[in-house]
Structures are given as structure tokens and as C-alpha cells.
Amino acid sequence: MKTDIHSQKILILDFGSQYTQLIARRVREAHVFCELHPFDMEMAAIRAFNPSGIILSGGPKSVYEPGAPAVAEELFELGVPVLGICYGMQLMSRHFGGEVVPAGKREFGHAELLCSGQPGQLFDGFFVGGASPVWMSHGDHVSRVPDGFQVVAYTENAPVCAIQDVSRNLYGVQFHPEVNHTPRGDQLIDTFVRAICGCTGHWTPGQIIEDAVTRIQEQVGSERVILGLSGGVDSSVAAALIHRAIGDQLTCVFVDNGLLRLEEGDQVMRTFAENLGVKVIRVNAEERFLSALAGESDPEKKRKIIGSLFVEIFDEESNRIEDARWLAQGTIYPDVIESAGAKTGKAHNIKSHHNVGGLPEYMKLKLLEPLRELFKDEVRAIGEELGLPHQMVWRHPFPGPGLAVRILGEVKKEYADILRRADAIFIEELYSSDHYHKISQAFAVFLPVKSVGVMGDGRTYEYVVALRAVETKDFMTASWYPLPYEDMARISARIINEVKGVNRVVYDISSKPPATIEWE
């Protein structure tokens, strides 16, 4: 009997925390499906969602301020377990008659959590060895606990850091269990969703593939699908998944826009057309893209130009494919969340997404997005399960607009050729020195400025290439990767000696924030 992987699910209500997506990822790591929605989700929609449990996120506001974000009173009457995190705990406390006030001493960063008595099921194993390290980020605290609630934990600066009313299945923590700085936080979330909410863990790569294949077959029927294949992880996994579901009904369009990595086009064709037997049409559109980008320096406008031209080319190709009724995309869940936030005004859209932009009315193509429920790590796991090459599945993220947003300012063919060669050397050296898989993302950036140099007996005046490598768990924050000096020196020497037009290499040591990972 086929398992319904959505039958057990957790609802996460977002109050504006920078960590909310991490909550969802921790729940998924427990092999339980969840969705993230704004805090003001209507009760009718919540009842229709029928959650096995609810998590209230943190947030930047104070619960005692006029107009502070809140939930409907009926939420706590649904009879399902509720876990409040930071602001969520304070909201729950205030709702049930407790008191929340500004803290005499705010807590931001590491803290030692101490147990106040009997920890109970949620905290089983959390205090092994005494104090448990946690991550705090709050300026308010609960000064009076509501009737029926027990204080479970405290810190040196905050007397109430975890509360519970076991009889009503209500739990609250002042710290952030979703972040890596709380080492046992994933264990706490796992306990909540599985032991307390009763979810048994159907959300696994094999089950997700089986469910997606069925849904694609039901959605598409006998109609044909066209997919824009970029060679990146998301579109590659989407192509493999759809091909498993409908076989030759899928035609992939691989647009070589002249802004891809070195030999990427040939690699894509080998993997999909030759090894997997997927129908792939290769479109050489380098001149069209470079012509459209000529003279444009604004990064957001470059993204829009590239996105619009991709849609235009897909439209042309779909008209050549008989009965093409669907356009498939590799949209993933973080894209959906961020784009939805941009529409509602409840999140700040830092960069426009290449995939989630909607389709022009005239295209008359229906949209197929089989990965839209998945985070990147889940997409990779599915890619491996589908048999895609390990190197393709675990390749570092590559932006939809390609090298266009790694060339600062105007995009020119000369710049793209220089950049792709420099980038290839950088990545090759990271592999050979065993750094690649320790780094979350690495790439070269072309700087359209020249500097004076000396080669042999002659003076040079050539371009600068910047190298960027970062470590991150979630891509919301990132630290620059401390590449050893000897490796930096070797990479720099190779680029300067092997890439004509470059006489200087610099290494980016900026973290996110304040810098973003990509330069544009």
C-alpha cells in the first residue's frame, strides 16, 4: 500500500525570525513533512492543513507592544502539540496569563542552559552531563509563568528559558534549537515531532520520489513537458525525476547562453543525452544573450534580461515540440518561501529568483515544479537516489544568470572567457587539495579593472580576478573559508600564468553579513 508522505505534517508559523527556515530543515531531517506559513494564517486554513503539531517561530518584535504579531486564540484549542521558540514561547506565555517584560540583561549568543527539575519527555537526554550549550537571541523574558506551566530550564541571566504544560502538550523554549550553535537542538526538535506529535517519519528520499512520480504522472497525463536544463543541481534533479515519471514525454532544452562554466555544455549533454537517455535539445544562444546584455551594468537588470530571454527561447522551442503543454522548472522550497514573502511584504526580497517569476500569459504553458516542496539538501539526496553522478549532485550552487552576475558591470565575451578559465583552475585546485567538499560554495569573480604588473622584462596592464570561498550550513549566514597560504599561492600562480589577460588575483575575506555570498 502506497504511503501518504503528507499525512503527518508539522505547521510552522513564522513571526519574522531569520532562523525560521532552519526550523523547517530540522523537522525535515527528522523525516517529517512540514510547511512554513505567515503567523497570521487563517484558522480555516490551519484546520484544513490538519497539522500533527505546530511550531511558533522566533521574531524581532516584543509581544507586549501594540500591534505585535499574534495568533488566533483558537490555535491553542486545536488539541495538537505546540512548541514555541523564543518569541513563540513568550507569545504562548502571555496568551495563557503569564507576563513578559524587557530583560534586565539581554542574551545574544552562547549560553549554558541548566535544568530546573524534572525535564520531561521533550528534554530527555538534553541535559546529559549537566549544563547544555544553547544559542540565545532575545531582549525580553518571561517574568511570570502561566498557571499550569512548569519551568524546565534557566540560564545565569534568565530564570525562565524552557516551560511546559504536559497535560495540554504545550512547550516553550527561549533558546533556538534550530541553529547549529545549539548542539542538541536537532534532538529536541526530533523528539517534539516524532515522540510528542506522533509522526513516524515517512519523509524519506525513496518515498518522496515515489510520491513525486505518481503526482507527475497524474498531473501531466499523456501531454509533453519541456524543461530548461542548466546543468545545476536543481534542474538536473528535476529532469531525472520527471524522466523517471514520464520518459520520452519529457524534452529538455539546454540553453548555452555563453555564461556557463568551462565545458559545462558538453558535460550536460553527456550526462543526460548519452548516459540517461533523456531527450535534450541544445540551443546555442550565446550571441543573443551577450547582445541583450550589452551596455547593461546593473545586476538586477542583468538578471531580468536573462530571465526574460530564457522564457522567450523556451517559448520558441515549445512551439517546435508537438503537444508541449508544460514547462518544468527546478524551483525549490526556499525560492517559494522568499518569493511568497516578496508578494505579501512579509519578507525582504534581496535578489529576484530566476525560476519563481511567473510565466507570460501568451505562453499558454502550465507550470510543473516537482521540487517546490524540497530544500537543497533534500534535492541532493533525491539526485543520488535517482543515480545522478556524485560530482553533479554535490556541485556548488551556481546562479541562474550564470557568469553574468560574477562579472561585475557590463558582460562581454572576453570577460566571460577569462572568468570561466580562472574559475575552472580554482575549482580544479580545490578538488586536488581536498578542500572542495569542505567548502559550501567557491567561485571566481571577474573585476573589470586593470592593474599594473610585471611579467618577464615587460610591464603589463591587465585584469583582476577575485576568488571567493565560504562555509555555511544554511546560506543565510556564511564565513569566508581559511584557505591555506600555500594553496592560495599555487592557485594565484596558475591563474596568472595560464589565463591570458589576468595579472592579479585577490581573495575575498568578507563574511555574510554584511556581504552577500555572490558579488552581484
From Swiss-Prot:
Catalysed conversion reaction: XMP + L-glutamine + ATP + H2O = GMP + L-glutamate + AMP + diphosphate + 2 H(+)
A single GO molecular function term of this UniProt record: ATP binding
Binding site for ATP: S230, G231, G232, V233, D234, S235, S236
Ranges for domain GMPS ATP-PPase: 203-395
Description of how the protein assembles with itself and partners: Homodimer.
NCBIfam families: guaA_Cterm, guaA_Nterm, PRK00074.1
Biological role: Catalyzes the synthesis of GMP from XMP.
UniProt name for this protein: GMP synthase [glutamine-hydrolyzing]
Species name: Pelobacter propionicus (strain DSM 2379 / NBRC 103807 / OttBd1)
Recorded name of the encoding gene: guaA
